[in-house]
């Protein structure tokens, strides 16, 4: 989506996000019911590092909500994409889908564009269906913002810590 369609879409999702009567739930479990170590600490660190750059303090629910809402307008990017997958496809197809998403991101980068994959959209599948044709046979997986990066934005300075290679790969001779 671009232009006016993107603006209408964003307004609709923001309205749904701020409607206490709206049913904003994902059709699938994106995250575990309860995070566990080491993933819990890693996720928190990235979150607090980002919020630190944005000047959002712990417990500042108003700024936290405002930042979350920026997801729904694709962080003001000029292009917003929604990705779906057939609901009967299993984990192997989801792995393929992840590789497809990565290829979209690599292709965009090769053209000087930046992307931001966004899980937040899965919770708004009902509202999304009001704006774009997503058949009942499909699940909304995620969204993705695309455009030229605004390097003056503090969030674009975030470089998350990475685990050392030896923590997640084994070389066998």
Task: Give, region by region, the residue ranges found by the protein language model.
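Acidic, surface-exposed loops and disordered segments
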Residues: 1-173
């Amino acid at each position: 989506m671009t232009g006016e369609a993107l603006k209408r879409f964003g307004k609709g999702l923001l309205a749904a996000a701020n409607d206490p009567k709206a049913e904003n739930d994902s059709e699938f479990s994106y995250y575990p019911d309860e995070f566990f170590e080491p993933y819990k600490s890693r996720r928190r660190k990235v979150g607090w590092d980002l919020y630190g750059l944005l000047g959002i303090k712990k417990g500042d629910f108003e700024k936290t909500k405002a930042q979350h809402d920026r997801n729904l307008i694709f962080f003001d990017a000029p292009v917003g994409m929604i990705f779906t997958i057939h609901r009967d496809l299993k984990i192997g197809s989801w792995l393929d889908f992840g590789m497809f998403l990565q290829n979209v991101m690599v292709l965009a980068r090769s053209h000087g564009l930046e992307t931001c994959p966004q899980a937040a959209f899965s919770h708004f599948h009902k509202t999304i269906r009001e704006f774009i044709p997503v058949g009942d046979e499909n699940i909304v997986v995620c969204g993705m913002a695309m455009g030229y990066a605004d390097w003056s934005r503090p969030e674009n300075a975030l470089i998350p810590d990475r685990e050392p290679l030896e923590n997640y790969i084994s070389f066998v001779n």
